[in-house]
Swiss-Prot record:
Record Gene3D superfamilies: Glutaredoxin (3.40.30.10)
Matching InterPro entries: Arsenate_reductase (IPR006659), Arsenate_reductase-like (IPR006660), Thioredoxin-like_sf (IPR036249)
Protein task: Involved in resistance to arsenate. Catalyzes the reduction of arsenate [As(V)] to arsenite [As(III)].
Species in which this protein is naturally found: Yersinia enterocolitica
Domain of life the protein comes from: Bacteria
Positions bearing the site annotation: Important for activity: H8, R60, R94, R107
Protein's name in the database: Arsenate reductase
Enzyme Commission number(s): 1.20.4.1
Pfam families cross-referenced by the UniProt entry: ArsC
GO molecular function: arsenate reductase (glutaredoxin) activity
Active site, renumbered: C12 (nucleophile)
Key words of the record: Arsenical resistance, Oxidoreductase, Plasmid, Transposable element
CDD domains cross-referenced by the UniProt entry: ArsC_ArsC
Compositional bias (Basic and acidic residues): 125-141
Length: 141
């Protein structure tokens, strides 16, 4: 069993790039398709605390429920926002990666490199052609 977990959306390029960087470090993570299997309330609260971000910082803003629910207004408590995220998992920004070195919202995807226990094992180029590591696994940016 892997000691790395990714909350993943396979339709998201950032999430796909993050997953491939984890694999490029020689690790096969536990993949949680969070739209199908959202975290529990307690899991989501822990993820937010472990990332050291606000609840609002985890909210996706460019999705339908954000507008429909009026979430741009600052009138909702953290607990209410968490409830909306659990009811509409598409509101949870992604990918979230948990490793022994920390928990991060990996936007941009190369943020994952800061918390991987093993280095990249070779060159990595994102889907859009941006080079992230060279042939020796050294970070380029």
């Amino acid at each position: 069993m892997s000691n790395i977990t990714i909350y993943h959306n396979p339709t998201c390029g950032t999430s796909r790039n993050t997953l491939e960087m984890i694999r490029n470090s020689g690790n096969e993570p536990t993949v949680i398709y969070y739209l199908e299997t959202p975290p529990t309330h307690d899991e989501l609260v822990k993820l937010i605390a472990d990332m050291g971000i606000t609840v609002r910082a985890l909210l996706r803003k460019n999705v339908e429920p954000y507008e429909e629910l009026g979430l741009a207004e600052g009138t909702f408590s953290d607990e209410q926002l968490i409830g909306f995220m659990l009811e509409h998992p598409i509101l949870i920004n992604r990918p979230i990666v948990v490793t022994p070195l920390g928990t991060r919202l990996c936007r941009p995807s190369e943020v994952v490199l800061d918390i991987l226990p093993e280095p990249q094992q070779g060159a990595f180029t994102k889907e859009d052609g941006e080079k992230i590591t060279d042939e020796s696994g050294k970070r380029l940016k």
